[in-house]
Amino acid sequence: VHWSAEEKQLITGLWGKVDVAEVGGATLGKLLVVFPWTQRFFAHFGNLSSANAIICNPVVKAHGKKVLTSFGEAIKHLDSIKETFAKLSELHCEKLHVDPENFRLLGNILIIVLAGHHGKEFTPSTHAAFQKLVRAVAHSLARVYH
């Protein structure tokens, strides 16, 4: 993936303001609510019986933070995203058997959450840069599947 200087600045500039715990928990929580079939990977997370139970679940929040911390690694290594996610791709494919479509869904939910948390700062240009990023991350995570 080729990144312009402007795209890199937009991504790193906004990411520096992201509360990884809050945004990560909200992103994973929304994924589990909006796409309930994804819950099958998280049955061991406890109460996932309702939208409120999922959003308030401390294990969902903690794992969301972990997911977004990992996503932050992509931002630190924009020029080597595939290499950055090689081991996670292998884990999700060979051990966890996660449908790679879920990576795209999670990225799209992240875009929505970022837009909600950052309002006017999440300009169309910032949105475009982050859309490119989540697409690159999803593709990298799905790499072992191909």
From Swiss-Prot:
- Record SUPFAM superfamilies: Globin-like
Q: Which domain of life is it from?
A: Eukaryota
Cross-referenced Pfam families: Globin (PF00042)
Identify one Gene Ontology CC term for this UniProt entry.
haptoglobin-hemoglobin complex
Q: Identify the tissues in which this protein is expressed.
A: Red blood cells.
What's a single GO BP term from this record? Answer: hydrogen peroxide catabolic process
Answer whether the UniProt record assigns the keyword Phosphoprotein to this protein. Answer: no
Entry's family note: Belongs to the globin family.
List the PANTHER family hit by this protein, alphabetically. Answer: HEMOGLOBIN FAMILY MEMBER, HEMOGLOBIN SUBUNIT EPSILON
Q: What does this protein do?
A: Involved in oxygen transport from the lung to the various peripheral tissues.
The protein's name is Hemoglobin subunit beta
From which source organism is this entry? Answer: Microcephalophis gracilis (Graceful small-headed sea snake)
